[in-house]
From Swiss-Prot:
One function term, GO molecular function aspect: aspartate 1-decarboxylase activity
Protein name: Aspartate 1-decarboxylase
Disordered: annotated span: 117-136
Active site: S25, Y58
Sites of Pyruvic acid (Ser) modification: S25
Keyword terms: Autocatalytic cleavage, Cytoplasm, Decarboxylase, Lyase, Pantothenate biosynthesis, Pyruvate, Schiff base, Zymogen
Length: 136
């Protein structure tokens, strides 16, 4: 039996743009995609902290270092520019593998620059995770 387990997330990202007439998806800065262990075309769940909306879509490559978080197509109706969102991926795992799995969390600032990256379970709260400056 396989379980659907939380794999990774980009936490507290800010929506930078919305394009209702573009094919449905979410465009994400590839630096953030890589840091979170996500991939282009991967299915994601998006949670809007401002209005409570939750929806699924897939990742499109955004320009590296741009901080782009753009909702496209129908998803553009579920968030406004400036809204805070969480972008989550899941993976299928056998129960034994899932027991030891530690999801990746990428915390970003208001401009979608990474502040902290950590494996959930290494720290009890995001506040205890070292910042990127502390890791180097």
């Amino acid at each position: 039996m396989k379980l659907h387990i939380f794999k990774s997330k980009i936490h507290r990202a800010t929506v930078t743009n919305a394009d209702l007439y573009y094919e449905g998806s979410i465009t994400i800065d590839m630096d953030l995609v890589d840091l979170a262990g996500m991939m282009p075309n991967e299915k994601v769940q998006v949670v809007n902290n401002n209005n409570g909306a939750r929806f699924e879509t897939y990742i499109i490559r955004g320009k590296r270092g741009s901080g782009t978080i753009q909702l496209n197509g129908a998803a553009a109706r579920l968030a406004s520019i400036g809204d805070e969102i969480i972008i989550i991926t899941y993976a299928e795992m056998e129960p034994e593998e899932a027991k030891d799995y530690k999801p990746t969390v990428v915390l970003v600032d208001k401009k979608n620059r990474p502040k902290k990256i950590f494996q959930l379970g290494e720290e009890t709260t995001p506040e205890e995770a070292p910042s990127l400056e502390q890791r180097n």
